[in-house]
Amino acid sequence: MSRAIQLILVIALFVVGSSAEPITTGSLIREMIDMRSLADFPDPSYKTVQFSSYDHRSNLPGGPEWFANSDGFGSEPVPNFEGVVKEPGEDGIGEYLICDVKGPGAIVRVWTAAIKGSIRMFFDGALEPVYDGSADDFLRRPYSTFGKIPGVKGPLFEGTFHQRNAAYDPIPFAERCRIVWIGNVREIHFYQIQVRCYEPEADVVTFQPEDLTKYRKDIKKVSKILSNPDENWVYSSSENAISIAATISPGEVQEVLKLDGPKTLERLSLKVYAKDLDKALRQTILQIVCDEYPWGQVQSPIGDFFGAAPGINPFNSVPFTVAPDGTMTCRFVMPFAKSLKILLDNRGDEAVTVTGSVLPAAYTWNGETSMHFRARWRVDHDLVASNQAVQDMPYLIANGKGVYVGTATMLLNPSPAPKSGG
């Protein structure tokens, strides 16, 4: 039986409208809580790539094996590695290249759901690995594998740098990164390794285990904020917050805030009141228009923009927080050169009241590097879940220079029967 599904996407990115400091383990750790840095195009620039145990038959978009899914369960039809370093012996153990990046870069995320064997990681042509140990430990908690940090007590990384099966431990390298997995390909070996590839001239200082001691103050500061951003976040603005309060009638579009620039918003907090709150959060459209553009750089249902949907679902993160009382906060900075307007478009059939505030901050707009924050939404109705009628769902088409910072996806499935795999 087919099942109709609605797919709702909110996509956020910054778009572009000196001389860089060296990239170090410390600078990358500090960047994890530096939302202000997103206002300008990165220098040096980079692209992000991912090495993974995906089914390597899936190499031609729209081809016959595009949706092949033997992605690390073992005994894949096509080996899911970059190359074979050493063929397996009688015990079935071989050595396989799972990541190879030439040029300056940084590992920024690793993940596994299950993997046996060991990993060796080499930097910059060195013959001795900087890491040689458990693959599972490295892909879940890289920093912890290098031993205890002097002067640091407690589970510093758990729930902050390390979250469930993924880890966000920055590991930079100057010239090259090679990672070899030693294991049995007939056994489960799920892995993902996400790497920033910087432009060739980038000045990057290669990671050393001693960095964790050298930058322990940065680690402790970042860990504290990541553990509870809503409570521990520090805003840099010296300006006063500006209140928002409005009641929007059905069918009305109301301008609820206007600011002159150049400035940036460091915080946007809103709370919606309505008889049917779930409907109001979906049917009230948030628009943020910077510098008199003909349409808003931000256009999204208000609840979806903050990641609250459906209804109010509390969570606490650096870019967004949704509190149990319905207060929704965005910490993505929103720079503008001349003006900023916030409009609320009530497309529902009942009045909606919205309260909140913005925190403006000083900002110097640079025509070469400054970027507007953008977030757009789209809905695909009546999708059919079928193993025969599979299809790709392109959700971002962008031109020019910019930095992609995230996507929120909501699936509305009318089928009451739970299915394996979610």
What are these regions (language model features)?
Residues 1-2:
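N-terminal secretory signal peptides that target proteins for export/translocation
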